[in-house]
Amino acid sequence: MAQSSYSSGNSTSDLNKIVLDYLFKKGYSRTEAMLRLEISSVGAIPEEQQDWHIGASETYVQVYILLRDWIDGTLDLYKPKLQKVLYPIFVHSYLDLLQKNDPEMAIYFFESFRIEHEVLHGYDIRALAQLKIASDVEEIEIAQLYRKNKYRINFTRSTFDLLVQFLFENEVNGSGIIIRLLNQYIDIKITMPQVEGKEDPNVQAVYEMDEAKNEQTIISEQEGIPGHSEQLLDYNKQSIQLGLRPLSEEVVTTLKNLLEVKDKDVEGRNEALNKILHPAKNLVELLTEKENLINESTLESPSDPPLPPTKMKDIDYFVSLLESEQNSLILGKNATDPSVFMYTMHNTLSAVNCAAFSDDASMFALGCADSSIHLYSSTNNGPQPLVGSQNEPLQKSSLIGHTRPVFGVSISPQKEFILSCSEDGFTRLWSKDTKSTIVKYAGHNAPIWDVQFSPFGYYFATASHDQTARLWDVEHAAPLRVFVGHQNDVDCVSFHPNAAYLATGSSDHTTRMWDVRTGGTVRVFNAHHSPVSALCMSADGLSLASADESGIIKVWDLRSSNQHVSFVKHSSIVYSLSFSYDNKILVSGGADTDVNFWDLTYRNNLSDGEQSPLLFNFKTKNTIIQNLSFTRRNYCLALSSS
């Protein structure tokens, strides 16, 4: 029997080297690369053995750029997951360069790429910037934290295989540096789908699409360094002003005079008929309540964005809002059940891409794949005429001008104008009266996915495939602000009620909130595990709802930046969200053809006997929900297509 050529005292690392040498000599280079990554589970390699593929200083810069550019070019399905690896590679490349006694190259590397990680890891980036020489890596706490603790990342098998394939193909370009850093300092957890208690490698692609449905499996272990505080929490604690926009004294005086006349008219009719027509509070009382609410939040009210002078039509519009609020329903578990007034477009052959209702519930607009926009208006002059008038014919008109499919439409608060955005890269402002284009806005260099008027109608925002959102006003053809920070398509936008902030949802799985006055990010929410498909701000300005392509809905408290509640019911992408005007109900709908009403007083930590947060589930006749909108009177309008 042949004697073994290896002594029993050989260490695990020596055996690993022997296996790697054997694989290299036999030509199994891909297997070699995978082994280098997967042996990371045995623990950190001692410093004296960390000599494999050290690389020249310049190679660190080249290979980091190579990795970053490769990730940017991957499919959107994998990009958000692969981007997680860039930060720990950045940190350890910087520390390596310091330990190589090349502080000049280390500082160049750090300053060149730090901006990519400032938002999510700002605290640690600022701490790492204090390192100047090799001895700092051994002495300063933040460096030792990263060197002695592995950075945890959760990958699916297909994502991991893509990374390994890239590293294998680029070993001649220096990817061995990345392989070494992954092996020594990064703990990649491979999560596989479970099928009857067993792994099923044949469903990997399906699992990528449904990854968020297995959320508990994937995120059961926190990513990053265990026990190290999440830097995003500190970033999201910066002060923001969520108060509502106060009314000028002149406007309040004019409003009160008008409302007193209307209240006296109602009282006179009540006396004549010997009954109460309006049991609700009168309009002056409602205005006083609203003033008090605004005054309570005065310290949180932002400086007013510049707006055109208030006109009489603006005051009339505000009066109509108060009248709607006066007659609004009270919804909830112990109050009135919600109702849905559904408008369905039949036999569209998937031609309807988007829809929007007017603020007064008198008209809606459709954006279509044939590049046209269709307007449907009620001939009824009463309040919210689209509610309860199913047998009434609607007036239809078409707007023609775009050259590619239309993906977003929005109707101004006073329904004078319609905005549309298209794959052709342009946004158009249309006149409702003349049915013609007033302004054509150019700025994006890619398809535009969404557009929305601000609550005051003068400003609007767009979201685009070029990874930016932009702020515009109706009077200028060039953007006022460009919001840059997302790492993938910006898919949806939603204004805060005070118009000082804008929320954006992206295919990079994050939701951001921007200050429209400065163009800077003030909040980042990254709890979704698939592209964000819908957003909605609550009427009080304190909550933001976001939904993703997996059907998961999250509601965020904007003051604390904490997740208020999470809802799981939809089986596919959610296209539309809407808060009731009393901020107690959230309605959602999408491709699974269901309309769901959620109780916002619910909390995730169910107590004994507490019911489900789902108040009602309405099923359609297999029609896709394109848009949902609560009216000012808390009725729900919906538009679907088949």
UniProtKB/Swiss-Prot annotation:
Molecular function terms from GO: RNA polymerase II general transcription initiation factor activity; transcription coactivator activity
One Pfam family in the UniProt entry: WD40
Protein name as it appears in the record: Transcription initiation factor TFIID subunit taf73
Subcellular location field: Nucleus
Disulfide-linked positions: none
Organism for this UniProt entry: Schizosaccharomyces pombe (strain 972 / ATCC 24843) (Fission yeast)
SMART domains documented for this protein: LisH (SM00667), WD40 (SM00320)
GO BP: transcription initiation at RNA polymerase II promoter
Task of the protein: TAFs are components of the transcription factor IID (TFIID) complex that are essential for mediating regulation of RNA polymerase transcription. Regulates the genes involved in ubiquitin-dependent proteolysis during the progression of M-phase of mitosis.
GO cellular component, one term: transcription factor TFIID complex
UniProt family annotation: Belongs to the WD repeat TAF5 family.
Gene (name only): taf73
Ranges: WD repeats: 347-386, 401-440, 443-482, 485-526, 528-566, 569-608
This protein's UniProt keywords: Nucleus, Repeat, Transcription, Transcription regulation, WD repeat
CDD domains named among the record's database cross-references: TAF5_NTD2, WD40
LisH domain sequence ranges: 11-43
SUPFAM superfamilies from the UniProt entry: Taf5 N-terminal domain-like (SSF160897), WD40 repeat-like (SSF50978)
Quaternary structure (record): TFIID is composed of TATA binding protein (TBP) and a number of TBP-associated factors (TAFs) whose MWs range from 25-150 kDa.
Coiled coil start-end: none
